[in-house]
Amino acid sequence: MGINFRVVPANIPEVNSGDYRAIAVNNAIAKAEAVAEDYPYELVLGADTVIELEGEVIGKPANLNDAAIILKKLSGKKHAVVTAICLSWREKKLQCIFAETSSVQFKTIDDAAISSYISKVNVLDKAGAYAAQEYGSEIIDTISGSINNIIGLPTEKLKLALLACGYNY
């Protein structure tokens, strides 16, 4: 997008219970507001991504065994990926909040395919234990919605939100 930025950890406890969309939105707001306290003259972006499968919120795996269990759950099924973003600009008293939802249909994958995938990708730092941009074709059948949302941030909507907040990049 051509925007210079710096990453500042929010260092806050994340909400992990309730409706998956509300979890993502509440975490994004909390992250943005925590950082905006120290950077009131800058536009701050807080984001959170949550995966939902059949009513269950799926986060990052605790270990490789947990990653294999998560990938087995996702096998052959469609799940939602929701990313919420909160833009906070305290100096201008602006706040913009939105969420983007995409869906991912997994291929039916067996234990050998799961082991192979885990051996190639650092699954421990990824919600759902996978990354669409890293060997995703081995486990993903189809994607509906924004691929950028699944990979990281929904840049299409983010560009519009930045302009709406008066940020000209």
Predicted region positions:
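Anionic-ligand binding patches
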Residues: 7, 18-169
